[in-house]
Amino acid sequence: MLVVAFASLLGAARAIMMPIDDPTTSDKFQITYANESLWDTLVMKNKTALESGELFDLGPDTKCFLPNMTRLHEQNVQSVNDPEYKQKLIDTLDMGAHIIDASLKNQCLVSQNGFWTYRYCGSGDFTQYHGVAPDPNDKLTYTLGRSSKQIENREFQLLYDDYGYYISEIIESGDICDVTGTPRAIEIQYTCGNVMRPGTLQWTRETKICHYEAQVIVPDLCQLELLSKNQDKKNAVPIICHMSNDVPDKHNIVDIVSNYDVSFVANQVYFLLPMNNSNVDRALLMYTGNATEDGLEMDPFPMEIYKKFIDVMNKMLGLGLLSPPDGKPFDVHDSYQWIGDIVDMHGNYLNRLRLDVDVNMEATLIIDKSINFTGPNNFQWYFRGSDRTKNSKSRFGSLTNDNMMLAGGSIINVDDISKENAQELLEKLVAAGKLSGVIEDNKITQGSPIEASKTKVTKASESTPVSEKNKKAKTVTKTIIRSRDKEEYFKENEKQGEENNAQVPFSAHNNEQHGTISKSERKEENTNQKQLANTQKGDTDTPPQSSQSSANDKLSRSGMGQKEPGVDEIGSELRGNSKKALGSNIDNSSGRSTLNDNSDRIAVENEAREIINSNAYDQSEASVDPNYRNDQQRLNSAKEHTFSQSKEKKSINSEEILETKILNSETLGNNDGVASDVKDEEVVESDRNGVIDDEL
């Protein structure tokens, strides 16, 4: 079983679709079965009927007679010239305008169509926006037209098309169009239809630049005879059919059409809504394609099948074909589960479809024959968003690490789908450039510190593209090695460092992004740092702030005031190596150290300063140029120096560790002080356990 989730089904993330003709305004047909005697009398031996209609086959054993629709339209056009009929048109327009005003006054109709959402408030504005609600200050909110509040100032017209009469109103004074420089305008077509009061906004489309059309169905307009064409009992065209035997086959398409209101949706799929007088209570989805060749009966199903039915469900919701069980319009935060059977043209069962929509308008589509279906109608359950309380529980069930995936920044329920199938599904749904990041993120334990760091770096990298040469310096990794492998590990790193230095010279960095600093400036800064260190040996309680200010001045002049993604992680590595150079012995029960003796503090600080100013690690260059911090050769030299120091000095007081943090805060330009450094960076080394846990 495959599960397809498509985000924001009722909102902005849904694929853009063009509106199709409203199924409630299309032609209706009423099919009547006739035995052979009645068939001969009404059709086969009726010359007038044969001249005004046509015969056609509806299956191998069924013949039907359809009246000529063109002649019916011609008769309607000819009747317009009648004076009495003209007066009837005038009266219909006048009464229709008052019905529209009364029905939609203080009411707002909303419909979603792809990226955009449309809202029309009677005697008010017609708005196009993106999001949950229109915001006048948002750049993605446009007013397509402004209607007058007084009915006397509104202009209505009674027009006619292939589907019959409708009332048209053009409202103007919309927002200025960026292309034409003129106000936007929209034509609203009011029609009769069997929908819930006060009405529905069926569709909205842009016919030309900044000119729009919309269709609004007002059920009370069906009170007017000329506008009631869409009522089945008044406009259904009678079709007479005769079968070779007198007992209709329940699996024949004629039987399906006679019990359901059929509406074409998309992709060879029809929506079958039970008629009021039928003995069925569940809607169906009829697939008219070849189910075997198209893979509808396969398990698992081809992705093309899911794409077809995702489009189908989008259009069904956009056209309002699905109605809540209480008969009220959908609310923005309603959640429900809708289940419908998929049948072929003969009514044979093919498969079962389930649509889950949660309160965040996220939808999940499942096609599976094993879906349990026990409800009296198509809704297995339904929760009103307005009735939901903070303590109410969702019927979706709990999300665990085994049945959730990260896709587009949202966690979705994939109904216990296996991770292998989920990954295969994502490969088809997620863009190739994002798939690797999605899969990689899920390899890390949920909620771990390293995951948070990696997510932070990844997001920064997305906003600022990172070249292939700089990726190593911008990635957070986690390495755990045994003590017996230390020498082999660092030798391998040294070899890798030489390869990296050969492939990625410092000159290859993007100077426009990182800024530059000349060798003379580095030399001058180096001298200033050493002089400042010598002058402060007598007073080690005060951190050398002036060296940092000098470095910041040069960074500001060279355009390096902002840190690039990953610099904090590289700085963490350098600070860790400085601690190793002094050795460490941290209380494993707490992972923290305290400072008790001021004399030890001074001694440790002086010793650390001498090590950092030695040839093993030139801190002045590392503090000036962030790229220089990634020099693998200097990093390996510091690591080699670590082992030589650790052999001479097996342990050190926890006070000395804290002093190392203070020193690193000064040399690496960390102005946050000791407290923040202790809180953010903790490196634990235990020679007794032989494990190093290091974040690079």
From Swiss-Prot:
CDD domains: Yos9_DD
Membrane topology: Peripheral membrane protein
GO annotations of cellular component type: endoplasmic reticulum lumen; endoplasmic reticulum membrane
Domain of life per record: Eukaryota
Domain MRH: 106-224
Spans through the membrane: none
Region of interest (Disordered), residue spans: 450-600, 667-696
Name of the protein in question: Protein OS-9 homolog
Species the sequence originates in: Candida glabrata (strain ATCC 2001 / BCRC 20586 / JCM 3761 / NBRC 0622 / NRRL Y-65 / CBS 138)
Name of encoding gene: YOS9
